[in-house]
């Protein structure tokens, strides 16, 4: 386990900092990821680390930009240390969809594939059980 996991997970209130999946209902801890990848001149500093579920971390990979579905190319992705989640995203409680409110939000939702069928089914279940905020 990453030695920074305790501090990063506590700061994130044990939820994915991208899709807000609740870590407590998974059978494995979430991953500490580099918001700006080391391969793209990111650092190991606390301000460049985020807690991510496996799905978001795999899809994010080394991406730092994405395509806004409204047609804007090369939009920077959501940065958990610099951006406010509620400003960029909203969750439709009936469908479980995470929707981008801004170009950053839309590009992040698309790049991280936040609304895949299995994720939507899980998110609807979490919402119905009161685990998803």
What do the PLM-derived regions correspond to, one by one?
Residues 26-30:
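A short coil-to-beta-strand element that immediately follows conserved catalytic motifs
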Residues 2-7, 11, 22-25, 47, ...:
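Extended charged
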Residues 31-37, 53:
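Histidine-centered catalytic micro-motifs used for acid/base chemistry in nuclease
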Residues 18-20:
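Right-handed parallel beta-helix
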Residues 1-7, 36-43:
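Short, intrinsically disordered, charge-biased short linear motifs at domain edges
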Residues 16, 40-60:
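Short beta-strand-alpha-helix junction that forms the catalytic/metal-binding core
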């Amino acid at each position: 386990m990453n030695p920074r996991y305790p501090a990063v997970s506590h700061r994130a209130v044990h939820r994915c900092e991208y899709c807000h999946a609740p870590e407590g209902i998974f059978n494995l801890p979430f991953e500490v990821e580099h918001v700006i990848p080391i391969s793209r001149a990111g650092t190991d500093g606390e301000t460049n680390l985020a807690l991510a579920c496996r799905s978001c971390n795999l899809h994010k990979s080394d991406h730092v930009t994405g395509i806004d579905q409204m047609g804007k190319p090369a939009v920077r992705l959501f940065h958990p240390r610099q951006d406010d989640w509620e400003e960029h995203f909203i969750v439709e409680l009936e469908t479980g969809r995470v929707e981008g409110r801004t170009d950053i939000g839309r590009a992040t939702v698309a790049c991280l594939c936040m609304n895949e069928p299995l994720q939507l089914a899980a998110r609807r279940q979490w919402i119905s059980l009161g685990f998803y905020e």
